């Protein structure tokens, strides 16, 4: 009997959670064209808009206005802060021109060094390489992989 009394008293003391969400839409001026204004807004105003929009998102999604949905998407996934693009417009063409200039410079430097280099080394002529082959054959050097030293034509 005492148990039933405590059970009923316990049921009366239950508190149901009630959410007090903001039911009216944010002003269009606050969320309209948020993409262009977001970076220049003070952080307190940004936090205010974020908190108001997060309260609005707790309601059914159909109750949000279109500018609010766009603002929520931009704040969550837009190109600001860590999601800002690494390259600005025009940077890719600047980088491509720099890479092309570097390649042309390196090819030109290679050509100048080859022209100023003079004659080939004496070990690069065919006679030297054939004599090296004969010497290695007489010493039985590396019989499995071969010992051919001929590289020139």
UniProtKB/Swiss-Prot annotation:
Pathway named in the protein's UniProt entry: Energy metabolism; oxidative phosphorylation
Conditions for induction: By oxygen at the level of transcription through heme. Expression drops rapidly when the oxygen concentration falls below 0.5 uM O(2).
Keywords, sorted A to Z: Membrane, Mitochondrion, Mitochondrion inner membrane, Oxidoreductase, Transit peptide, Transmembrane, Transmembrane helix
Positions of transmembrane segments: 89-111
Any GO BP annotation: proton transmembrane transport
InterPro entries, per database record: Cyt_c_oxidase_su4_fam, Cyt_c_oxidase_su4_sf
Mitochondrial matrix side: 21-88
GO MF term list: oxidoreductase activity
A Pfam family assignment: COX4
Residue ranges annotated as Mitochondrial intermembrane topological domain: 112-153
Functional summary from the UniProt entry: Component of the cytochrome c oxidase, the last enzyme in the mitochondrial electron transport chain which drives oxidative phosphorylation. The respiratory chain contains 3 multisubunit complexes succinate dehydrogenase (complex II, CII), ubiquinol-cytochrome c oxidoreductase (cytochrome b-c1 complex, complex III, CIII) and cytochrome c oxidase (complex IV, CIV), that cooperate to transfer electrons derived from NADH and succinate to molecular oxygen, creating an electrochemical gradient over the inner membrane that drives transmembrane transport and the ATP synthase.
Miscellaneous notes: Present with 3670 molecules/cell in log phase SD medium.
Subunit structure: Component of the cytochrome c oxidase (complex IV, CIV), a multisubunit enzyme composed of 12 subunits. The complex is composed of a catalytic core of 3 subunits COX1, COX2 and COX3, encoded in the mitochondrial DNA, and 9 supernumerary subunits COX4, COX5A (or COX5B), COX6, COX7, COX8, COX9, COX12, COX13 and COX26, which are encoded in the nuclear genome. COX5A is the predominant subunit V during aerobic/normoxic growth, it gets replaced by COX5B under anaerobic/hypoxic conditions.
Family recorded in the similarity comment: Belongs to the cytochrome c oxidase IV family.
Name by which UniProt lists this protein: Cytochrome c oxidase subunit 5A, mitochondrial
Organism listed in the record: Saccharomyces cerevisiae (strain ATCC 204508 / S288c) (Baker's yeast)
Phylogenetic placement of the source organism: Eukaryota, Fungi, Dikarya, Ascomycota, Saccharomycotina
């Amino acid at each position: 009997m005492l148990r039933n009394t405590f059970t009923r008293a316990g049921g009366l003391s239950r508190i149901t959670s009630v959410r007090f969400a903001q039911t009216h839409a944010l002003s269009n001026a606050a969320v309209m064209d948020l993409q262009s204004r977001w970076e220049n807004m003070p952080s307190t105003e940004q936090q205010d808009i974020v908190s108001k929009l997060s309260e609005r998102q707790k309601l059914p999604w159909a109750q949000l206005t279109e500018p609010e949905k766009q603002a929520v998407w931009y704040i969550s996934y837009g190109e600001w802060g860590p999601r800002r693009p690494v390259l600005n417009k025009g940077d890719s063409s600047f980088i491509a021109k720099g890479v092309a200039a570097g390649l042309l410079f390196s090819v030109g430097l290679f050509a100048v060094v080859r022209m100023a280099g003079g004659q080939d080394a004496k070990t690069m002529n065919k006679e030297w390489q054939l004599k090296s082959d004969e010497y290695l054959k007489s010493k039985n050097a590396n019989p499995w992989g071969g010992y051919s030293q001929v590289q020139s034509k």
